């Protein structure tokens, strides 16, 4: 672990962040393609996990942004994975982890992250607001995740601009796309709305986009395939190549 002063210097010298928020509001199916080796609900998903090899294929297939799991115990991820992906990609990269301390926000930027996940359920209101403000000061607009109306109210009160609705209940891992549909009406139009987890077909994206969602986070459905670019192109339909 870097000393605090060294970490902050590294974060401030990393260069400008890529525009994560802007990448999610283009007039198309904006998919955040997630790179992960394992998950608490499925165990190891991809034994031959090489994020640096997978990221360019997902970008070429049309991903709007990439999400990289850096949590070690449950997802077998690392900050090294994020650094490797950032070096081989041109689109924004999000750090996905259980972020509960401002130190991790500095750490994310120093590793090259352009955004990071804030899970409303695991932080109090004070920490949520503090890390939102810190992220913005470092040019990173965070993805603030919610699963209920109460959590959405907290996220909006803290000033979240990118709201992710997790269709997976973290208490029992049950997945319901209706969670997104139930909450979309309460997400202001000037916020970026992201539907996360449980998306399995192009029709799911059509349905959710029609309801008002701007972007979609998809991981396991991609990672379980030998070539994840194939299902990503199927999700995107006619939009199968990233615009140069």
Positions of PLM-derived features:
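Short acidic, glycine/proline-enriched helix-loop-strand junctions
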Residues: 90-91, 139-140, 190-191, 235-237
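C-terminal helical cap(s) of enzyme catalytic domains, especially alpha/beta-barrels
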Residues: 182-186, 209, 222-244
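N-terminal active-site wall of soluble small-molecule enzyme domains
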Residues: 30, 35, 42-143, 149-154, ...
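Catalytic cores of alpha/beta
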Residues: 100-111, 147-159, 195, 199-218, ...
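An N-cap/entry alpha-helix motif that binds or orients negatively charged groups
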Residues: 1-48
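Active-site-adjacent beta-strand anchor residues
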Residues: 75, 145, 194, 198, ...
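Catalytic-face loop-and-helix region of soluble metabolic enzyme cores
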Residues: 162-218
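Glycine-rich phosphate-binding active-site loops on the catalytic face of alpha/beta enzymes
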Residues: 110-127, 165-173, 211-232
